[in-house]
Swiss-Prot record:
CDD domains: DLP_1
The gene coding this protein: Mx1
Critical for lipid-binding: annotated span: 520-522
Record carries keyword Methyltransferase: no
Protein name per UniProt: Interferon-induced GTP-binding protein Mx1
Role, per record: Interferon-induced dynamin-like GTPase with antiviral activity against influenza A virus, (IAV), influenza B virus (IBV) and Thogoto virus (THOV). Inhibits FLUAV by interfering with the process of primary transcription, probably by affecting the viral polymerase function.
GED domain location: 543-631
Pfam families xrefs: Dynamin_M, Dynamin_N, GED
Positions of region (G5 motif): 245-248
Amino acid sequence: MDSVNNLCRHYEEKVRPCIDLIDTLRALGVEQDLALPAIAVIGDQSSGKSSVLEALSGVALPRGSGIVTRCPLVLKLRKLKEGEEWRGKVSYDDIEVELSDPSEVEEAINKGQNFIAGVGLGISDKLISLDVSSPNVPDLTLIDLPGITRVAVGNQPADIGRQIKRLIKTYIQKQETINLVVVPSNVDIATTEALSMAQEVDPEGDRTIGVLTKPDLVDRGAEGKVLDVMRNLVYPLKKGYMIVKCRGQQDIQEQLSLTEAFQKEQVFFKDHSYFSILLEDGKATVPCLAERLTEELTSHICKSLPLLEDQINSSHQSASEELQKYGADIPEDDRTRMSFLVNKISAFNRNIMNLIQAQETVSEGDSRLFTKLRNEFLAWDDHIEEYFKKDSPEVQSKMKEFENQYRGRELPGFVDYKAFESIIKKRVKALEESAVNMLRRVTKMVQTAFVKILSNDFGDFLNLCCTAKSKIKEIRLNQEKEAENLIRLHFQMEQIVYCQDQVYKETLKTIREKEAEKEKTKALINPATFQNNSQFPQKGLTTTEMTQHLKAYYQECRRNIGRQIPLIIQYFILKTFGEEIEKMMLQLLQDTSKCSWFLEEQSDTREKKKFLKRRLLRLDEARQKLAKFSD
């Protein structure tokens, strides 16, 4: 008697709290965030899976042909003390149905399945929970999954087999799940779909238990094959196999009670010439299976708790950080709302100013806006330099035209100023569209950066975001137009060929000295060739002089355009653009009647925040439960 009492105390002190903890976490919805230790029951249709669960739970579950289990069924069994009354409860969605008699279970589950999956043969991944408290059940929680079917029949969806497999796989592939695979003893174990699926997700068989059913239907002479399976010689599983004999259809029709069925099962294995050894080894009968599963689940839970605690803490931190990204909740009263809006707009304006002043924070691998603009301006300067270095066919044509057609009394070497001026004007004018194109590229770049800040700061407030984005577009068009007008005006001014005398003289002198130095170098390298070329024809003198003057003016022109165009763009497209946005945002605050409208959150943002808050709430509760369990 003392040993029995000690065993009861062991269950009450160790086993039940472990299982209750996981059941509580599952009831809180923690399984939405991470996997919980569980035993999932799978089997092909007509494998005897329902009979095994009935034998363990002591209640009649839905039976019939075709798909009977159409939703995952969480079967929570709680052992009561002798003399306590049976009680049950079926829960799904927000519905709870209290049961006072085991005979009410089947109808309640059918109603739940019809409610969730619809009347018919469809399936759903939503859970139905069945709580059974009785002196005749073990402390155990199982998840019953739909039976595997290969072919759709009747009104079943054509892809019903694929749907069921996908549903089963979501459970059995989790490392936290022990897979209880139910297989009839009278079939070739290698052909069963359930065992094949279990092997696919658990190749080493580390977390799979096999349960053989219907041993009374094994053909005479085939008993040895069943024993080979039980001895792990055919399809090895590290957790091995159990074998049970549940009520058959005739037993049910004859209303054989579960107690009588257990007695009948005990006699069957005890008297069987082959299978009696399995009873002696504790591998046969439903009571042995129940004890084994309780031990497996309890051990599995205890091993999983440290990792589970880490996962809950990690999920809590992740959800907290994600919720923080959405910012503070919007205040309820108007005065505080206005203050909230002012703070949001002030923060946005600060971010815009940081961007303009090249003080913004950028992610790793990205670069600041001003760095991107500087690269554009450097490319512009390089473009001008390369452009002026190249001899335009038009320049050569103009000089030939002057030599051959229009040269008058000028002595060799004198430059026609009108020809010089004409060449300069056309060459400089050709750069105008390149400058305007750069303006448009930079404008797009700057607007993109401004809108990115806008989306980051106001992305959750659709009305405020759309209003500000529209205003930014207006400001962009105005600033771009003003900048373009000034750029085109600058190029019009560049049509006046002018340079300070002293500057021009110095530049021309430098160019001539460089070219003279080149000629000296050539003479040193090849004196004979230099002697022949030194007798300049009159055409060569004029062309050389013209080229030198063009180079001198190009240098000064390049300095002007290379500096002035980027300054114009920076002023209108960066500095003034940002300042106008800042003014515009402050003007939005003037209309206080729109404060609430501006702060209306997008529906998906509201839902996401609600979701994260619910998640944090259940994770907080889960942490409390774990802490209490550990004490």
